[in-house]
């Protein structure tokens, strides 16, 4: 018997805040098994390497606290290398995360004419069967990541240019620029679902994302705040082992305690690595919940605003199912 037996709520529809939250929790409740399975297979290896980079970064920092080295260039090069590796791995994991979450959402919301789900039991889908769907989403994920990078680079350059023109860097200027930047973040979050759920170009998608974002600014802030609060509490609790190992190492190094030899031992390094791995993996799982909530906010915005008369229908996700299947058969 199928895992999903009820009629699924349409993806593209107007939603109140309670509807956005309930649709998010309904999706997670119905699909937590395939979601965790796909995320674990795709992202855990990246997390394993990222945990090494993160541990190397903290070890270098605490090692420099314990030594009196004057090799500033060597220290900066080491920090830059490990920090850069951590960021690149984070970007790769984000691409996998976006592709997996939104491919699964399309499969979940693909419906027949009578409203029944096309895919009745996603729990039985193997990673090999799921891979073509995630691969089809990778291009959209790349667009959203590049758009985010462009957004941050442009804003940083604007801030630098404004400060240079005003020839002032007082607290008032910083507060105004900071408030302006924060106000732009909710619309920027709509970049991810716009590229993922619509066949749009790079600049057209960016324009549409910011129109959706500004017109539904309050809704984005409300749903992301609540979902982020819940996920941050869970992630914060599960990150305690890593935080404790990092704090213990920092304390023993700064105090130059006899326990410094213990924090450099194999056992402590293994515990520190595993706790960092758990911390990073849990954070990505938490981010998936935020992506789901933003997607339902996007579905609401499409129905409420109907920009460019785009034909938003859940049966379009059935084409995604068929196209990915045909692609896999080549």
Language-model features, listed with the residues they occupy:
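Non-cleavable N-terminal signal-anchor transmembrane helices
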Residues: 1-79
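Short helical patches
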Residues: 1-8, 21, 138, 165, ...
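Juxtamembrane transition segments at transmembrane-helix termini in multipass membrane proteins
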Residues: 2-7, 11-12, 60, 65-73, ...
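Interfacial aromatic "cap" segments that immediately flank transmembrane helices
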Residues: 13-46, 124-154, 186-234
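Helix-boundary and loop/linker segments of multi-pass membrane transporters
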Residues: 26-30, 72-77, 131-135, 166-167, ...
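Hydrophobic alpha-helical transmembrane segments in multi-pass membrane proteins
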Residues: 38-59, 82-98, 142-185, 223-250, ...
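N-terminal low-complexity, Pro/Thr/Ser-rich intrinsically disordered segments
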Residues: 119-121
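Proteins with a high burden of low-complexity, intrinsically disordered sequence enriched in S/T/G/P/A and R
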Residues: 161, 169, 209, 308-313
């Amino acid at each position: 018997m199928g895992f999903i037996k009820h009629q699924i709520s349409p993806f593209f529809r107007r939603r109140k805040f309670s509807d956005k939250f309930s649709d998010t929790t309904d999706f997670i409740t119905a699909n937590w098994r395939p979601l965790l399975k796909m995320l674990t297979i795709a992202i855990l290896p990246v997390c394993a390497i990222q945990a090494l980079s993160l541990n190397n970064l903290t070890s270098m920092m605490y090692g420099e606290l314990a030594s009196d080295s004057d090799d500033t260039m060597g220290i900066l090069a080491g920090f830059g290398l490990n920090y850069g590796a951590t960021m690149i791995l984070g970007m790769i994991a984000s691409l996998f995360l976006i592709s997996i979450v939104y491919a699964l959402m399309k499969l979940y919301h693909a419906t027949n004419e009578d409203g029944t789900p096309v895919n009745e039991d996603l729990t039985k889908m193997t990673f090999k069967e799921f891979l073509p769907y995630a691969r089809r989403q990778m291009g959209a994920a790349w667009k959203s990541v590049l758009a985010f990078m462009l957004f941050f680079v442009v804003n940083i350059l604007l801030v630098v240019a404004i400060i240079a023109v005003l020839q002032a860097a007082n607290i008032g200027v910083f507060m105004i620029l900071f408030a302006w930047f924060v106000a732009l973040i909710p619309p920027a979050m709509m970049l991810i679902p716009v590229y993922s759920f619509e066949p749009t170009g790079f600049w057209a998608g960016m324009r549409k994302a910011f129109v959706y974002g500004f017109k539904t600014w309050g809704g984005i802030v409300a749903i992301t705040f609540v979902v982020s609060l819940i996920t941050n509490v869970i992630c914060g609790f599960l990150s305690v082992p890593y935080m404790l190992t990092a704090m213990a190492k920092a304390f023993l190094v700064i105090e130059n305690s006899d326990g410094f030899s213990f924090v450099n031992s194999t056992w402590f390094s293994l515990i520190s690595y595993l706790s960092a791995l758990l911390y990073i993996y849990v954070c990505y799982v938490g981010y998936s919940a935020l992506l789901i909530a933003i997607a339902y906010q996007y579905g609401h915005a499409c129905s409420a605003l109907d920009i460019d008369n785009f034909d938003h229908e859940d049966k379009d996700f059935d084409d995604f199912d068929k196209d990915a299947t045909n692609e896999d058969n080549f």
